[in-house]
Amino acid sequence: MNTNDFDFELPEELIAQTPLEKRDSSKLLIIDHRQKTMVDSHFDHIIDQLNPGDALVMNNTRVLPARLYGEKPDTHGHVELLLLKNTQGDQWEVLAKPAKRLKVGSQVNFGDGRLKATIIDELEHGGRIVEFSYDGIFLEVLESLGEMPLPPYIHEKLEDAERYQTVYAKENGSAAAPTAGLHFTTDLLKKIEAKGVHLVYLTLHVGLGTFRPVSVDNLDEHDMHSEFYSLSEEAAQTLRDVKQAGGRVVAVGTTSIRTLETIGSKFQGDIQADSGWTNIFIKPGYQFKVVDAFSTNFHLPKSTLVMLVSAFAGRDFVLEAYRHAVDEKYRFFSFGDAMFVN
């Protein structure tokens, strides 16, 4: 298939720049790909789409304040680093600007030298491996000096950094939020659990590759980014029990889908505790092994995330649903509205 097969018209004013005041007040488009139906609803009604005995699977990763602004001590030139992933110890892969000035051995200071970074390797596309030095605990230093790395299509400053975290965010490590989870409130999750739905958590640390456009025409030539995932034995056992009892595995967001399907592909459809790196690319033709339904936000044209949704619900029907969402003025992307896919 061709990348352009997943293009659609999106007016720029539909790209949500700020979160709604109430997390669960966003709109929800409920689609059923077998019945070919679409229903306009609101997110707090997602509980009506869940049955007792189902499992609702959420990604509990927490976004790091991963954008750092500093300067080179020799030239006082301004430098921006965006932390991508922890490679080992105090070494991180980062995206650097301006990268051309940062050669191996270069040093960057942040916060009057409270945090120092030394370039130890150069990667392509402005990537660098840096080693940090600091006093105290790294995450605490980062919390005081770093800024939340909002996606490139959001131009307004975020008033409350916690609005770019899910209410169940726990495991530090992401460069972007698993945005399908931003709609849930603690109260809504309590109601869902009281209905007899199992709440299950996994971890996938979202990398910036999630925003990287597909740069090839032929999907088979696309090089998918890798992200770290983890599923505990307790979570795996709950999911096995749910499947055995005839319940559904309902994933919250594409990151949960990619984790579950990575594990399902690795263990021939079985659900086992596992951790590692995944670069799974789910596109039309893929046979789903674990996920029975899911919620997700509205994604960028020609993105791998639209391709993933199309793999589950069919390209033509998904693009029809997206056209409906545009006509009905749904809000798109990270702070936008949601879709529930049966």
From Swiss-Prot:
Catalytic activity, reaction form: 7-aminomethyl-7-carbaguanosine(34) in tRNA + S-adenosyl-L-methionine = epoxyqueuosine(34) in tRNA + adenine + L-methionine + 2 H(+)
Entry-linked SUPFAM superfamilies: QueA-like
Associated pathway: tRNA modification; tRNA-queuosine biosynthesis
Signal peptide: none
Superkingdom to which the source organism belongs: Bacteria
Name under which the protein is recorded: S-adenosylmethionine:tRNA ribosyltransferase-isomerase
Compartment annotation: Cytoplasm
Keyword check for Zinc-finger: no
Keywords from the UniProt entry: Cytoplasm, Queuosine biosynthesis, S-adenosyl-L-methionine, Transferase
InterPro entries: QueA, QueA_dom1, QueA_dom2, QueA_sf
Molecular functions per Gene Ontology: S-adenosylmethionine:tRNA ribosyltransferase-isomerase activity
EC number: 2.4.99.17
Gene name per UniProt: queA
Function: Transfers and isomerizes the ribose moiety from AdoMet to the 7-aminomethyl group of 7-deazaguanine (preQ1-tRNA) to give epoxyqueuosine (oQ-tRNA).
A Gene Ontology biological process term: tRNA wobble guanine modification
Gene3D superfamilies: QueA-like
Family statement drawn from the similarity comment of this UniProt entry: Belongs to the QueA family.
Pfam families per UniProt: Queuosine_synth
GO cellular component terms given for this protein: cytoplasm
Subunit structure: Monomer.
